[in-house]
Amino acid sequence: MVENKLTRALRELVAAAVKNFALPTKPERGFAEGELRAPQVVSGYLPPKRTGQKDDFPFVLVRADEGATDQDSTEVKVSIIVGTYSEEYDGHEYCLNVMARIRTALCSLPGMVLANRYRLQHPIKWSTYAEQPYPYWQLDMQTTWDIRTPQPIDKEEDF
């Protein structure tokens, strides 16, 4: 549950960071150019593709990938995956620009704390794939968050 709340808060931050960033989309059949739109921010994974649906690109996926809990704290690794579309061979730069906006939003968090409870650890990592599925481009960001581990309440304590 804590991980879901973390990714929800992170999706809100990401959505605010990219909301005014117009990126190209795949042209629909019969059109020379696609429309420009901000990346959709999605929890977890892209939904299965159905016939007749618009292309998913551009997008930003936010998902908790792994975690570890000890007595005092929980560490959660969250991936932020950026996908863009461009028929130009410098299309990977769209991914870098989206990543830069997200990174700026993350590094601007007061005290590196999101929603008053999730502490961002540095470094923020990112990587691209050597082989990109042209004309689609992808970049992966890796963030690590510290959360205070919920403590059990002793039923015999009187509050």
Where do the language-model regions lie?
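Acidic-leaning, charged glycine-interspersed low-complexity segments
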Residues: 93-159
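Generic short beta-strand segments
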Residues: 64-65, 83, 144
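Residue-level signal for secondary-structure boundary sites
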Residues: 70, 86-90, 147-151
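Ordered, soluble secondary-structure elements with a strong preference for glycine-centered loop motifs
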Residues: 4, 89-96
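Small/polar-rich, solvent-exposed N-terminal microdomains that initiate assembly or binding
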Residues: 1-70, 154-159
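Short, solvent-exposed beta-strand/turn "edge" segments of beta-rich domains on protein surfaces
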Residues: 67-73, 130-134
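Extracellular structured ligand-interaction cores
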Residues: 57-59, 75-77, 136-140
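Short acidic, glycine/tyrosine-flanked loop/strand segments centered on an H-E-D-like triad
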Residues: 75-88
